């Protein structure tokens, strides 16, 4: 589906941080040492709940910002919201395309 829609997907190790605050630069460095390619506050709780219910799961996460300490500017919730809004049509199309093939 992603190829048909000319979307770039990446596979990697996702490390969950519970939030609600952004991860710190030190946590990001530790996650990198432990092999994480991305960090975030979503996907994992939903996957745990679904697995607990006996569902088969596929985790797909939109990485909406660079992790703390990667770029010189501080993280911003506004930045995350803007990226999510910009990506929503493509992300929705990807998910709907996958669901149509089940």
What are these regions (language model features)?
Residues 1-62, 66, 78-102:
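Glycine-rich phosphate- or other oxyanion-binding loops that anchor nucleotides, phosphorylated ligands
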